[in-house]
Amino acid sequence: LIQDSLSAFGLKVESITDRTAENAAALLQSGHILVALMGKGSLTNNGHFIIIAQIKENGNVYIADPANYENSTKEWDLQLLMDELKQVYDYGGPLWAVSAD
């Protein structure tokens, strides 16, 4: 779903198997955005998608959370988000890197 949908708009999408905070930070620093399927935790009780869009110098990130605007207005710990990725997944999830090239 994610790969096919974003590829249809000419975006490059890669399923990420190294879901460490260090790798996610490197992807963000290289200009990618991340699509993350979240499990139960700080952002959701059931699971939903967020965009991890920007990393700050302190290592925290900004997200786009369609279920809760307030979550999109504050910094988040990247390790926390990686820890709360959905554990049961398919179709290349729960983490994808997206770029324009």
Please state what every model-predicted region is.
Residues 7, 12-70:
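Active-site-adjacent substructure of cysteine-protease-like catalytic cores
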Residues 3, 21, 25, 49, ...:
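Extracytoplasmic/secreted envelope proteins and their assembly/folding machinery
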Residues 1-15, 93-94, 98-101:
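Cysteine-nucleophile protease catalytic domains, especially the papain-like/related folds used
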Residues 29, 33, 55-101:
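Noncatalytic regulatory segments and standalone regulatory/sensor domains
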